[in-house]
Amino acid sequence: MGVKYSSKINKIRTFALSLIFIGFFVMYGGIFFRTSPIVMTLFMILGLLFIIASTVVYFWIGMLSTKTVQVVCPSCNKVTKMLGRVDVCMYCNEPLTLDPTLEGKEFDEKYNRKTRDKKS
């Protein structure tokens, strides 16, 4: 069975959500050090930094999302956003491309890299 792909926007949003949960767990970890206010404060500040990083990532992907190309998926007929030369539909995971040279080829995220690997 092949690799399960996800749209790039959803991957970045999932990363931002994981930063929030990491921040919460780090802050909860600080509760175990109630007897040492300095260590507890460090854990709380570190957790807050994770949550602030998540906010920055959400803001960045929101700004990036407004500039993306919107296409209609041929499988589910829903409007989805594409980042790069190849991406997958956000709803049905159908491989999508706007590059005519890649039509009909096997989907691979390596097509989005600026430098292509040359086979020797």
Swiss-Prot record:
TM region(s), chain numbering: 12-32, 42-62
Broad class of where this protein is predominantly found: membrane
Keyword field contains Transmembrane: yes
Keywords from the UniProt entry: Cell membrane, Membrane, Transmembrane, Transmembrane helix
GO cellular component: plasma membrane
Family in the record: Belongs to the UPF0295 family.
UniProt name for this protein: UPF0295 protein Aflv_0370
